[in-house]
Each structure stands twice: as structure tokens, then as C-alpha cells.
Curated annotation (Swiss-Prot):
Residues 169-183 are annotated as: Leucine-zipper. This is bZIP transcription factor 50. SUPFAM superfamilies: Leucine zipper domain (SSF57959). GO terms for cellular component: endoplasmic reticulum membrane; nucleus. Residues 143-167 are annotated as: Basic motif. Residues 141-203 form the bZIP domain. The gene is BZIP50. Transcription factor involved in endoplasmic reticulum (ER) stress response. Acts downstream of the ER stress sensors IRE1, BZIP39 and BZIP60 to activate BiP chaperone genes. Residues 150-163 have a biased composition (Basic and acidic residues).
Amino acid sequence: MDVEFFADLDLDALLASFSSSAAAAGSGVSGLFAPSPPHDAEAGSPESVSSRRPSPSREAALSEIERFLMEEGPAAEEGVGAEDFFDALLVDGGEEEEEEEGKGSEAGGSTDGDSGKENEVATPDAEKEDVEAEVDGDDPMSKKKRRQMRNRDSAMKSRERKKMYVKDLETKSKYLEAECRRLSYALQCCAAENMALRQSLLKDRPVGAATAMQESAVLTETLPLVSLLWLVSIVCLLPVPGLPNRNPVARSSAGRDLATVTGKKTSSEQQLEETLLLHGRRCKGSRARIKLDTGPFRLAAAAC
């Protein structure tokens, strides 16, 4: 590759380009390579041979170029490469620009320090609003975007409210269903208890009694108690047997016999009979009336 490059290289044109800048600008890159010799030129002409022989100055330039090319590889390995050089150059230029901007900002900050402090104390919301106002401005597209964002937010909030409302309704419906289920169970229990009481009443009913007339359990239980209370009260109200009369004046047998024959009642007997009648009226049953036979009491009172 290097041999072909040196064969095609025209040293005369290269040296001419170094000596004359105008000639180099006019010829350009095409002047670096030697034009092909004409076909009619003789191969063994003295002019062609003399032109092909390099001069001493050309030999020195050629040797210098060869030395430069030979030393390019080690120099690149030891020194800094082209890419690193350009990167460092760009970085240095950027740092210089940043330093200049920093100096300008420091100068501006010294003149307007209060405004800088206010900007530092500003809240993030205010900064965000300022940025949005600067970016959006009064552009119709920005207004449309803001409106769409507001509509989207409102729709999202409405959906959340709807979800919460539906959730509350579901909770209430579940509670009401549980309450209805509990009440239905209580109703079934009451119906079963009522049926059991009715069966017990029918079982205790005497043979031949009418099944159309049904009595409650409370009345069936209270009637025997009332009858027992009536019997005890009658026994307690029985007159105490009288003591023998110690009065020396004996009663006339005629008067006693007359009262017995005529059947007249004394005041004590009348009061006892009225008391028993009143008590019997109060203790009457619902199915049948309790009749009071006062015959034995009259005989006991007459005997006294």
C-alpha cells in the first residue's frame, strides 16, 4: 500500500504547493498527483528520463517526509491522539464559556441580590406555575391541552366518587340482607313455639270438648290458681265456733225455737252471706260460674 502511494505521488507538485500558496490553492488536491504521460511520448526520450530523476532538494524533502511518516506511529503512541486532542480542545472551550457566564451571573447577582433571594425562597408550586405560564402562554393549543387535563381530572374524580357510592350501597344492602335473614329466623322460631303451645293445649283438652273454642296457655294456667285462692279465702272466712254462754240469764227456749222455726236471719248472718256473695262474684271463671251453696253455712249459724 505504501509503495503504490509513493509511486503515484508527484514530489514536484508537492514541493511547488509548499513554495507557492497561490499555486496550491489553484491546483487543489488534484495537483498532488502526477498526470498520466501522453501516449505519443517516447519512453526513452532524455526529457522524460531527466524529469524522472529527483533533484537533491527533492531527495531531502522525500527523506524528511519518510522520517516523519516513520516517527508518526511511536509519537502517537507516546503522545496524545487526534481524538483526545480535539476532545480536550472542545472541553476547554466549554469551560471557558461557563466561566464567562458565571462571571456575568455574579455581576448581575451583586446588582440584584434581593431578587435572587426571593427566587430561592419561592415555593415549588409557584415555580411550576411560572414555568407553565412561560411555556404555554396564550397559545390555543396550550389552552386546549389544559382544558383536556382539567376534564380528565374531573372525570377521574367523578369515577372515584361513583366507586365510593357504589361501595357504600353494597355495604348497606349486605347489612339489610343479614337483618332480614335474622328477622326471618326469629319469625320461624316464634311460629314453632306457637305451634308447640297449641299442640300442648289440644292434648290437655278433655274428651268431647269443642275444638273450635281455643284457650290461651295463660288462661289455662291461671284458672287453677284462682280456684285455689277462692277455696283458701272461704276457709279463712268460716266463723269460729262460739264459746259457752256464761251469762246467768238463760235464753228463752221459746225465742230460740221461734227464730229457728220462722227462719229469720240475724245481722251477723246477713253480713257473712253478703261478704261471701261479693267474694264469689269476684272469683267467677270465664267458662262457668261458680255457684255458692249457703245452706250449710246457715245451719252452722243457727246451731251457734
